[in-house]
Amino acid sequence: MIEPLLCGIVLGLVPITIVGLFVSAWNQYRRESAMPDWE
């Protein structure tokens, strides 16, 4: 049987991890796409 605390931690960390990866990937893509504009 899964402990409520462990289940809560997993349900809380998973969305944060997904959002964190998406934001970091978007920032990297935006930085690379905007690089030619600075030159």
Swiss-Prot record:
The keyword Hydrolase does not apply. The chain crosses the membrane at residues 5-25. SUPFAM superfamilies: PetG subunit of the cytochrome b6f complex. It is a single-pass membrane protein. GO terms for biological process: cytochrome complex assembly; photosynthesis. It comes from the Bacteria. GO terms for cellular component: cytochrome b6f complex; plasma membrane-derived thylakoid membrane. It is found in: Cellular thylakoid membrane. One of its GO terms (molecular function) is electron transporter, transferring electrons within cytochrome b6/f complex of photosystem II activity. Keywords: Electron transport, Membrane, Photosynthesis, Thylakoid, Transmembrane, Transmembrane helix, Transport. HAMAP family: Cytb6_f_PetG. Belongs to the PetG family. Component of the cytochrome b6-f complex, which mediates electron transfer between photosystem II (PSII) and photosystem I (PSI), cyclic electron flow around PSI, and state transitions. PetG is required for either the stability or assembly of the cytochrome b6-f complex. The 4 large subunits of the cytochrome b6-f complex are cytochrome b6, subunit IV (17 kDa polypeptide, PetD), cytochrome f and the Rieske protein, while the 4 small subunits are PetG, PetL, PetM and PetN. The complex functions as a dimer. NCBIfam families: PRK00665.1. This is Cytochrome b6-f complex subunit 5. It comes from Prochlorococcus marinus (strain MIT 9211).
